[in-house]
Amino acid sequence: KVPRQDAKFSLLDLISKSLESNSTELKDGDILCISSKFVALSEGRYVKLSDVDVSSYATEIAEKYNIDPHLSELIVQESDKIFYGFDGFVLTFKDGILVPNAGIDTSNIMPGYAILYPEDSFKSAKILKSEIKKLFGTDNGIIITDSRLMPTRIGTTGVAIASSGVKPIEDERGKTDLFGNSIRVTQKAIADDLSSAAQLLMGECDESVPIVIIRDSNLLVSDNDQSSQTFSVGFDECIFIKGLSNSKI
């Protein structure tokens, strides 16, 4: 649990103070799951909505889907692709993730502001891993997390938007199942699974728990660099998007 932050701050300093106030020390192999919005806030990635100039395209989206025009403009600027929308939301592709409103949030931020994703989540994770090792002398993994919706399911789960030092995917292809059948497509989303576990403690409201330490996971912590290509496929390869695009229903 950490104090509420209302402006840009040093994430490393806050982690250090939080460990001390919670009488906790990091150990080699610990994995830190950190809220993407908390990382973004530490980097100053928040915007006063009234300061955003609205384009005609953003106005069109705002009117069509009942979205604040200034928020709509941020969605246009931040999205890698916009698919479609419904009342209050548009479905977008951002940093390898299918996410509403380009991951932009107006909750857990000062009224009248919106908080974005970190500028470069993988770079942020890598730098933080290095800084923690210098400060504490421990080798830790970093996962930057967010909450997400799953098709046809009620409620949110966790998703990893970036990591450093944690192998995000375990490839099961080529192995055999209980009956000797060859596994053809299965790859375990390790970083996403850990993010979902952390999400149970982080919550979505006023819990003030943006950082969760995962210990004794038996996962190897390494210095391998990651990218969005390590985590995800392009939207043109996504089974949900392709399936719905080709649906004749």
Predicted features, each with a name:
Residues 1-249:
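N-terminal and secondary-structure boundary signal
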